[in-house]
């Protein structure tokens, strides 16, 4: 909401524990500026690019994304990714007050709602590195 209220044309979301590399923001922005409405920093668009996750967590994440893709028809490989760049119009159109879920379901709902509204979604491959310090909320 802050990005919308302050007039930004592109709004990015990422983990702030450096699981997402800030250097990749440029690639997400470029893909959005080239005509994509939502750009996902994807762990799974080119194989599996996850470092230091237990195998059980990796398998659960990977197959959950496959399941969601089958059920929803979302044309992306990493449906639960939290590293994204939105064009302003997407967030204004989907109505953030109508988003109901939290956590991973929030990530899916945002992408699915944008997709159902006809927005173009693209993936950019990233390497996700599990945090070494801190905890998830």
Regions found by a protein language model. Give the residues of each.
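Acceptor/aglycone-binding surface of glycosyltransferases and processive sugar-polymer synthases
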Residues: 1-3, 8-10, 22-104, 131-137
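Acidic metal-phosphate-binding loop of nucleotide-sugar-dependent transferases
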Residues: 18-19
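Catalytic donor-sugar/metal-binding loop of nucleotide-sugar-dependent glycosyltransferases
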Residues: 75, 98-102, 111-129
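DNA-recognition element of transcription regulators
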Residues: 108
């Amino acid at each position: 909401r802050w990005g919308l209220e302050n007039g930004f044309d592109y709004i990015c979301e990422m983990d702030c524990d450096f699981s997402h590399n800030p250097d990749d923001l440029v690639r997400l922005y470029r893909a959005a500026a080239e005509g994509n409405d939502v750009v996902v920093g994807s762990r799974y668009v080119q194989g599996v690019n996850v470092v230091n996750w237990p195998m059980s967590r990796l398998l659960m994440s990977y197959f959950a994304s496959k399941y969601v893709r089958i059920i929803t028809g979302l044309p992306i490989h990493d449906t639960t990714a939290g590293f994204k760049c939105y064009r302003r119009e997407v967030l204004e159109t989907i109505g953030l007050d109508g988003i109901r879920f939290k956590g991973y379901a929030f990530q899916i709902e945002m992408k699915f709602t944008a997709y159902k509204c006809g927005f173009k979604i693209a993936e950019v491959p990233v390497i996700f590195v599990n945090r070494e310090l801190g905890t998830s909320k």
